[in-house]
């Protein structure tokens, strides 16, 4: 039998469905993306804090639907522009 939380995505999806709060889901996704896309930079902690703060401010100002679109756009551009 496979472990219950075998991947980060399953953990985030399961936790957000249990909590059923858009802000919790949004925060978890922001933290995981910030840690995964910015971990190779020189000072990842300040960049992570900046990224999460930016998304929290945008979330509180304009709401989750527009921010999710912006979030997806930034995520896809960050993935495709990352040097391997």
UniProtKB/Swiss-Prot annotation:
- The entry's protein name is Uncharacterized 9.2 kDa protein
Taxonomic lineage is: Viruses, Varidnaviria, Bamfordvirae, Nucleocytoviricota, Pokkesviricetes
């Amino acid at each position: 039998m496979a472990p219950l939380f075998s991947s980060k995505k399953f953990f985030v999806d399961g936790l957000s469905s249990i909590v059923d709060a858009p802000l919790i889901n949004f925060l978890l996704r922001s933290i995981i993306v910030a840690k995964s896309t910015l971990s190779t930079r020189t000072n990842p902690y300040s960049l992570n804090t900046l990224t999460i703060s930016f998304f929290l401010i945008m979330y509180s100002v304009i709401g989750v639907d527009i921010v999710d679109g912006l979030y997806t756009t930034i995520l896809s551009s960050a993935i495709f522009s990352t040097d391997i």
